Amino acid sequence: MKILFVDCCISQRGKASRTEKLCRTFLRSVRAEHVDLKNLELKPFTAEMLDRRDGLFRSGAFGDEIDALARQCRDADGIVVGAPFWDLSFPAQLRIYIEHISANGVTYYYDAQGPHGNCKARWLLYLTSGGDFARDGSLGTEYWKQLCAMYGIPEFRSVFAGGLDAMPEQADAFMKEACGKAGALAAELLNTADFPD
């Protein structure tokens, strides 16, 4: 079982990051391949980068560094994404990562019927926390849900620890509840009997 952890747990709190605590709760019983976006220093795609990647796609020459993150995402059995709830969605580093993994011919492909997913993952779990409370149609959550459909990942789950700054006197209780949900999802999603060797 190959689990990919996309870590965008950017916080002034450092190791006291609330989103990171959610992620640690879920991941404590499994080894995951860790992509730390805080240290990766990805750059947004430029026209030149797109031309290069499109050229590789046309020639079928995948394996270049430019699509390495996309191949890593495509090959995972399960994906965990951790990011704080910022400005109604998530930090810019995560959006730039999405540009790098959304590679035609790697994580998805087109034919006459439209786009089709190419990812092996059975599920993607989005873990997030924020000072405010959850709203219906949260942009970050909806974005990942749509990406799962595009990448062919059949199951999307999310846990949001919200209200942590709006009601600081209840923040510990809110975190405990969210960590409980993350732990329950770990027991369900990380059942190794469901994954091939």
Show which residues each predicted segment covers.
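Short secondary-structure transition/capping segments
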Residues: 72-88, 128, 153-170
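Glycine-rich phosphate/pyrophosphate-binding loop and the adjoining helix
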Residues: 135, 141-197
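Conserved nucleotide-sugar donor-interacting segment of glycosyltransferase catalytic cores
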Residues: 101-113
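Cofactor-binding loop segments of dinucleotide-utilizing enzymes, especially the Rossmann-like FAD-
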Residues: 8, 37, 127-130, 161
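Short histidine/acidic/glycine/proline-rich micro-motifs that form metal-
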Residues: 9-14, 130-134, 165
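N-terminal beta1-alpha1-beta2 submodule of the flavodoxin-like/Rossmannoid cofactor-binding fold
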Residues: 1-99, 103, 180-197
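Short, glycine-/small-residue-rich phosphate/pyrophosphate-handling segment
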Residues: 110-153
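Hydrophobic/aromatic residues located in beta-strands of well-ordered beta-sheets
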Residues: 3, 32, 123-124, 156
